[in-house]
Regions:
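Short, Gly/Ser/Thr-enriched beta-strand-loop segments that form substrate-interacting elements
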Residues: 374-391
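Loop/turn elements at helix/coil->beta-strand transitions in domains of secreted/extracellular proteins
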Residues: 4-7, 71-78, 232-233, 268-271, ...
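Aromatic-Pro/Gly-enriched surface loop or interdomain linker
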Residues: 196, 208-272, 303-306, 314-327, ...
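Short, well-ordered secondary-structure micro-motifs within conserved domains or adaptor modules
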Residues: 1, 263-283, 298-300
Length: 392
């Protein structure tokens, strides 16, 4: 949408509002709009550590600013909203101090910006980091950027270098941008099975630093994931959507079957029956599954919203297809399924594509009942704006 010779403006280039004292979300944002809940779940409320909201607000604010500068070649400027929410105690000059968002914008608004296009933040050790590195030249003096050198490092939380490399960058004209696709190989060896790291970028021109940036990444060994599976237990898999590729990638042992009847065969002596991608289920199969579960059998439904509703209609009434689906929040962070997983780690998975990677493809609508434990959820941000119903 364009109008010749007329500027376009946007109301509230906003990413949320921490209060000026603790850093928790402002009350109206927290309790009426409920947007903080969609981002960080129960960490949004006053009993939680405000660091979760401050960290998330800094992330989305910085990412939004960098994304616009990487992609919009016709923007003359961006007015981010609102400055007073990026600091603690803005009304007291003796005690004012910046929140994390200030530092995120300080990096994002450098005149010469080195910026990584990262879609996923949770990755496996030894894999190639799928990214484009952009150089945006908005120098205040209007000069072109000469051929430069990009230095990259993967660092652990102590700043120790785990992997590094350099890439040449061609000249970039003023008011232009250029990207490269460097070969960044994530380290094979990590200090722990799951390690918090940073991608650190430094751009130099004629040996002098002109831009720097950093991005948090969560790296894990495949053994960390597979280690949650008890190999002494027998897993039987009915696979209709190639979930076996995931199991094979993680070296999880399983026995494949081709039907519900075969899956539930007592001769297999399964400890866990996994059903993945089964979109239809007849009455006989439904009765078999319910009978198996009622006798103590363990079933895991993956990507089967239709089958789950068919088998348990008294509990599951339908589903919602999320418009985003990149963030899932924990309803029960004390559940064993979340052992060794932090509350902000059910998001920004990696699928090696230039698209928002989904953490969920559907949200089941369930009755509140003593037989139902909701482990995790997903809620659309600003769901009320386009006519959404409160119950949805």
């Amino acid at each position: 949408f364009k109008m010749a010779d007329r500027p376009l403006i946007s109301q509230e280039m906003s990413t949320g509002y921490p209060n000026n004292e603790t850093g928790h979300p402002t009350r109206s944002y927290q309790l009426i709009h409920q947007n903080p809940y969609t981002l960080i779940g129960y960490e949004a409320y006053d009993w939680a550590d405000p660091v979760s909201f401050l960290k998330t607000q800094a992330f989305i604010t910085g990412e939004l600013a960098e994304t616009l500068r990487r992609s919009n070649d016709q923007a003359s400027g961006i007015m981010h909203f609102a400055l007073m929410t990026w600091f603690r105690q803005t009304y007291d000059y003796q005690n004012i101090e910046p929140y994390p968002t200030y530092y995120a914008l300080k990096r994002a608004l450098q005149p010469v910006l080195v910026s990584a296009e990262l879609w996923g933040r949770n990755l496996y050790a030894g894999e190639k980091l799928p990214t484009r590195i952009y150089i945006v030249n908005d120098r205040e003096d209007g000069t072109d950027l000469k051929p430069s050198l990009l230095h990259w490092e993967i660092q652990d939380e102590t700043g120790k270098c785990l992997a590094s490399g350099c890439e040449k960058v061609p000249a970039v004209k003023h008011y232009a941008r250029h990207y490269i696709e460097p070969n960044i190989q994530l380290p094979n060896t990590l200090p722990a099975n799951k390690t918090k790291t940073k991608l650190v970028l430094k751009l130099t021109e004629n040996g002098l630093p002109i831009s720097a940036n950093e991005y948090e990444l969560l790296l894990a060994r495949k053994e960390w994931n597979a280690g949650q599976v008890n190999n002494s237990k027998k897993i039987v898999l009915l696979d209709k959507d190639n979930t076996k590729a995931v199991f094979d990638f993680l070296n999880i042992k399983y026995q494949p079957v081709s039907s519900v009847k075969e899956l539930l065969d007592s001769k297999l002596k399964a400890d866990l029956c996994v059903i993945s991608g089964l979109t239809t289920c007849n009455d006989e199969e439904k009765d078999l599954l319910r009978a198996y579960q009622s006798k103590g059998g363990k079933l895991l439904f993956l990507n089967n919203k239709e089958t789950a509703k068919t088998v348990y209609p008294e509990y599951i009434t339908g589903w919602i297809i999320p418009t985003e689906g990149d963030i899932v929040i924990m309803e029960r962070n004390d559940a064993p399924v979340f052992n060794d997983i932090d509350v902000l780690e059910l998001r920004y998975f990696n699928n090696n594509k230039r698209e928002i990677p989904m953490a969920c493809t559907a949200t089941l609508k369930a009755h509140r009942h003593k037989n139902v434990t909701e482990l995790a959820g997903q809620m659309k941000i600003h769901a009320y704006i386009d006519g959404g119903k409160p119950e949805d």
